[in-house]
A protein has these predicted regions:
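Bacterial N-terminal signal peptides that target proteins for export
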Residues: 1-12
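Boundary at the C-terminal end of the N-terminal hydrophobic targeting segment
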Residues: 22-29
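Acidic/histidine-rich, surface-exposed loop or edge segments in extracytoplasmic proteins
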Residues: 33-54, 368-392
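Short, solvent-exposed recognition patches
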Residues: 50-365, 375-376
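Surface-exposed amphipathic alpha-helical segments
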Residues: 381-417
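Bacterial N-terminal signal peptides
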Residues: 11-21
Length: 417
């Protein structure tokens, strides 16, 4: 040990002694893949979810109690799954949550808060068992990081099991998205995108977006771009008027003269000349920006042409073409190539949530659909670079797969209304 390290070590020992503490003796953790685990008690919904989602969904205390009762029923079903009923190498924690709800700005017909079933979720976590030495004692724990398995309840919106966004819609706040495509089955459950769906009719969860609806969103997105450039042009035009105003110019030069005098510059005319040059440069820059062949002026002209492109196209379409289901080809090089009503390779149907799927006659607390998310992370074992899926640990993904593969699907279907 060199002198510097020796001094650092001695200093640390002295500091601990002064503080009256002791130096804990730690050891590396040891994984215990054969140790028996346990199912820990359910975490109450009140401790795992905030009030935001409850308020947004206009849920009463009675509704929340009933919804938690449904989640507890699901917990009981999953707890009986042979693959995880008697945990070995991991312990299980389960809890629920209530999702938020908001009406999108561009979502005609989306129900108001309180008109849909309570949306939330159920989380299954298989945490590894390990131990370590501390101060001469063996400490065993079953916590830490793990791959969680989520079950979404009564949630059918975009972005849950697929990114689903449409670049041509920009940042518009809409409930429309690209439909998650079917990808076969896992453990007897249909896979759509990155999720497994348990429902009366998985394909009925979403309703087609008409071509008119898809193109209207393009119009709105491009109108926003035009508006932004128009606002920039207005600001730059106003600034150019100020720069060219003789009174403003005289004021700036007078202020320059006063500053030069206050600083006792040896040659104030040089400084004043610099200010005049700066004014000229600012004017030239603004003129360039406002030119329709360059800068903001050109960007505005381009944005207006792009807006006309879609509005002109809409005007050319027949009522039947506007009503046809829209399809989005992400790699299309033109607007018309991207938005088509003809299903083809690389083209995904555009959809919205089918709010009519939910039976309004049932209590709002009733579960009507479950989507198991994050399937790629834990089930894509063919990808050798997927470390989570191929982990040798009995916790995390291995336990998640055992749960999904051995859980009683018929009991879950019976649990759904």
């Amino acid at each position: 040990m060199n002198l510097t390290l020796s001094r650092l070590w001695l200093g640390a020992v002295v500091l601990i002694a002064v503080l009256g503490g002791s130096m804990p003796a730690w050891s590396q953790t040891r994984s215990l893949p054969d140790a028996p685990g346990t199912w820990k008690p359910w975490k109450p919904l009140s401790s795992t979810t905030g009030s935001g989602g409850v308020k947004e969904q206009a849920a009463t205390s009675a509704l929340m109690k009933a919804f938690e009762g449904e989640l507890l029923a699901l917990n009981a079903i999953l707890r009986r799954a042979p693959g995880v009923a008697s945990p070995v190498g991991f312990s299980v924690e389960t809890w629920g949550h209530v999702a938020g709800y908001r009406v999108s700005e561009h979502a005609p017909g989306q129900p108001a808060a309180g008109k849909l079933p309570i949306a939330g979720g159920f989380t299954f976590g298989a945490f590894p068992i390990f131990e370590y030495e501390r101060n001469g004692k063996t400490i065993r724990e079953d916590t830490g990081e793990t791959a969680l398995q989520q079950f979404l309840v009564n949630q059918i919106g975009g972005g849950l099991i697929d990114r689903g966004g449409v670049a041509d819609w920009g940042p518009l706040d809409t409930d429309a998205f690209q439909k998650p495509m079917p990808q076969g089955e896992i453990a007897g459950l249909p896979r759509y995108g990155d999720g497994l769906i348990i429902a009366r009719d998985p394909a009925a969860l979403w309703t087609p977006l008409p071509q008119r609806g898809a193109l209207d969103l393009v119009v709105k997105a491009r109108q926003l771009v035009v508006q932004e450039f128009e606002e920039s042009m207005a600001a730059q035009t106003a600034q150019l008027a100020i720069v060219r105003d003789p009174a403003n110019r005289a004021k700036r030069l007078k202020e320059a003269q006063e500053a030069a005098a206050l600083a006792k510059m040896p040659d104030p005319q040089v400084f004043i000349k610099q200010i005049e040059q700066a004014i000229a440069i600012e004017e030239a820059s603004l003129v360039k920006e406002l030119d329709p062949t360059m800068g903001t002026g050109k960007s505005l002209a381009d944005a207006k042409r792009a807006l006309s492109e879609v509005t002109d196209w809409i005007a050319q379409l027949s009522p039947a073409e506007l009503a046809a289901p829209s399809c989005y080809a992400e790699k299309g090089t033109t607007l018309r190539a991207r938005f088509t009503t003809v299903a083809a390779a690389g083209c995904r149907p555009l959809v919205r949530p089918n709010y009519g799927y939910f039976n309004a006659a049932l209590p709002r607390s009733a579960p009507q659909v479950v989507i198991i998310t994050g399937i790629k992370r834990c089930f894509d074992t063919a990808d050798k670079y997927n470390l989570d899926a191929n982990s040798p640990s009995p916790s995390g993904c291995r336990a998640n797969r055992a749960l999904v593969e051995t859980m009683d699907k018929e009991a879950i279907r019976a649990w759904l209304r």
